[in-house]
Each structure stands twice: as C-alpha cells, then as structure tokens.
C-alpha cells in the first residue's frame, strides 16, 4: 500500500481505516489494507476491521493464499466488498486454527488450506 499511495508505512499506520476508505473512494475500488487487523473499505463508505488472524500471516505466501480465496469468492458471484470481507475473515480464522496447532511462527501458508476446509465443513451444517 505504501508503494501504491506514496505514503510511508508509519503514515499508513496512523489511520488505517481512514486511509483505506480514502483510497477506496479515490480509486473506486474495494481496498484491502493487510496488517494486524486487516481493513476492508469500499467506495460507498463501508469499512470493516477483521478480528481474525495472527502474526504468522506476515510470512511470505500468505497473501497469495488470501488472493486465491478472494478470487474464488468473486468467481462464485459475491460482490467485491462481501468477497473481500469474507476472504479476509476466513483467511484469518483458518490461520488462527493453524497457529493453535503449529504456533504462530511455526505455521506456513500451506497450513492455512486444510484449516479452511475444516471451517467450511463445520459451518455447512
């Protein structure tokens, strides 16, 4: 996000929700500002802060898993904001489950996938 906006990481940290919303409106796009408590903002003013996830998601490759999840939800026909909010939530929840088994710093991005399947299975009832 720092590269896209020209803002420093420190500046981005000062008002994550406000900055995500400002750029969602400016770019007319849903913005996902990853980090501790990832922010999802839409051009129409909706903002959510994700309660799931842990520092293990800072590992390279976890964003690729999130991107794949988001693409899959979009392909299923969910509107962009809902798809982003769902993908971010499920990604973090699956990572929390993986961290409970392997530790936040022991988990790898591929550990998220089986936990995602377990989340779907539990909530499909």
Give residue spans per PLM region:
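Short beta-alpha connecting loops at secondary-structure transitions
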Residues: 2-6, 50-57, 67, 71, ...
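N-terminal loops that bind phosphate or other acidic moieties
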Residues: 3, 13, 45, 57, ...
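Feature representing long, continuous alpha-helical segments
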Residues: 18-21, 48, 67-68, 81, ...
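Active-site proximal loops enriched in glycine and acidic residues that flank catalytic Cys/His/Asp
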Residues: 33-35, 42, 51-52, 61-63, ...
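Glycine-rich phosphate/dinucleotide-binding loop and adjoining beta-alpha-beta core of small-molecule
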Residues: 1-52
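Charged C-terminal helix
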Residues: 93-125
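Short, small-residue alpha-helix embedded
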Residues: 2-3, 59-90
């Amino acid at each position: 996000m720092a590269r896209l906006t020209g803002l420093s990481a420190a500046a981005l940290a000062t008002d994550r929700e406000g900055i995500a919303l400002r750029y969602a409106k400016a770019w007319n796009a849903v913005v996902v500002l990853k980090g501790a408590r990832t922010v999802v903002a839409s051009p129409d003013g909706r903002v959510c802060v994700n309660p799931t996830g842990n520092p293990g998601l800072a590992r390279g490759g976890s964003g690729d898993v999130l991107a794949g999840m988001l693409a899959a939800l979009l392909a299923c026909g969910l509107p962009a904001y809902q798809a982003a909010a769902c993908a971010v939530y499920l990604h973090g929840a699956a990572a929390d489950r993986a961290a409970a088994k392997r530790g936040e710093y022991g988990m790898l991005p591929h550990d998220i996938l089986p936990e995602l399947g377990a989340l779907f299975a539990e909530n499909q009832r």
